[in-house]
């Protein structure tokens, strides 16, 4: 059977090209210890910035704060039609943090009771989809892949149309009750659009050190659930779990945090309870 695979996220013009060609400074030194920034330099920089946005598909605006759990954007369920697209869980996080392993465990734990579909996002490959199929997470026709061809966050935030189409197709074909979306590995500033994800999970792991939670960023601060994965490696990498716990609680304003070993199913009961609780509160599940 051919593996369902969608090339590129969104419309044809949503492919993202990186052409960072900024001419920020025009330095003309005439024996003096100063910098000359003329208006033509400023205008050319602005023109380059606008060209970058046009070619890239979106801008990378600076954030003034690391975000806030209490002030995060919440899903709006008043007009949400779960018969068109089931309750959607978005899973994000850096490369190698354990996102795909989490999807595998969720499919195994929830797939026996609920109708589930999965959409994975990769830049140029379908490795995550193939991993899930190879490990029999679900029947392979329920696992779709999108090749974003550019910044992973663009397909889950700026232009979510490709993911929405794939999810709605799964809904139409299998009458799904829960849908899972995995973002390509990205940085701490990446997060899901509420147009796509009803419940946002962000996965980090201890291998980056115990400083990661306090670095913040929308993924850590504004996700509905933060998972700190691979706790069994803490001693090996010199990470202090108590420090991670303290910093995560502070920056997330006591929002939900689960310390986990996803591969070993440690913490999975709590994770599934939080997901199902959110889906039931939204009216998506009874």
From Swiss-Prot:
InterPro entries: CobW/HypB/UreG_nucleotide-bd, P-loop_NTPase, UreG. Its main location: cytoplasm. One of its GO terms (molecular function) is GTP binding. It comes from the Eukaryota. GO terms for cellular component: cytosol; nucleus. Residues 9-26 have a biased composition (Basic and acidic residues). It is found in: Cytoplasm; Nucleus. GTP binds at residues 93-100. Pfam families: cobW. GO terms for biological process: urea catabolic process; urea metabolic process. Residues 1-47 are annotated as: Disordered. Keywords: Chaperone, Cytoplasm, GTP-binding, Nickel insertion, Nucleotide-binding, Nucleus. Belongs to the SIMIBI class G3E GTPase family. UreG subfamily. Probably facilitates nickel incorporation. NCBIfam families: ureG. HAMAP family: UreG (MF_01389). This is Uncharacterized urease accessory protein ureG-like. It comes from Schizosaccharomyces pombe (strain 972 / ATCC 24843).
């Amino acid at each position: 059977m051919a593996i369902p695979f969608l090339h590129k996220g969104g419309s044809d013009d949503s492919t993202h090209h990186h052409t960072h060609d900024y001419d920020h400074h025009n330095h003309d030194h005439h024996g003096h210890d100063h910098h000359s920034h003329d208006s033509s330099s400023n205008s050319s920089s602005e023109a380059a910035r606008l060209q970058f946005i046009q070619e890239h598909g979106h801008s990378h605006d600076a954030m003034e704060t690391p975000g806030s759990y209490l002030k995060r954007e919440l899903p709006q369920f008043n007009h949400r039609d779960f018969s068109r697209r089931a309750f959607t869980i978005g899973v994000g996080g850096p490369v190698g943090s354990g996102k795909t392993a989490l999807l595998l465990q969720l499919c195994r734990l929830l797939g026996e009771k609920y109708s589930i579909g999965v959409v994975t996002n990769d830049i140029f490959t379908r490795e995550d989809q193939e991993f899930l199929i190879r490990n029999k997470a679900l029947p392979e026709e329920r696992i779709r892949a999108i090749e974003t061809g550019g910044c992973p966050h663009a397909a889950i935030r700026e232009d979510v149309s490709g993911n929405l189409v794939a999810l709605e197709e799964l809904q139409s074909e299998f009458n799904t009750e829960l849908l899972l979306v995995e973002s390509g590995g990205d940085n701490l500033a990446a997060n899901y659009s509420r147009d796509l994800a009803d419940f946002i999970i962000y996965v980090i792991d201890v291998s980056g050190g115990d400083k990661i939670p306090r670095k913040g960023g929308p993924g850590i601060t504004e996700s509905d659930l933060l998972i700190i994965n691979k706790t069994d490696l803490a001693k090996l990498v010199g990470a202090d779990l108590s420090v991670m716990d303290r910093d995560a609680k502070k920056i997330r304003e006591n929002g939900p945090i689960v310390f986990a070993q996803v591969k070993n199913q440690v913490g999975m009961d709590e994770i599934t309870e939080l997901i199902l609780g959110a889906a039931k509160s939204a009216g998506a599940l009874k």
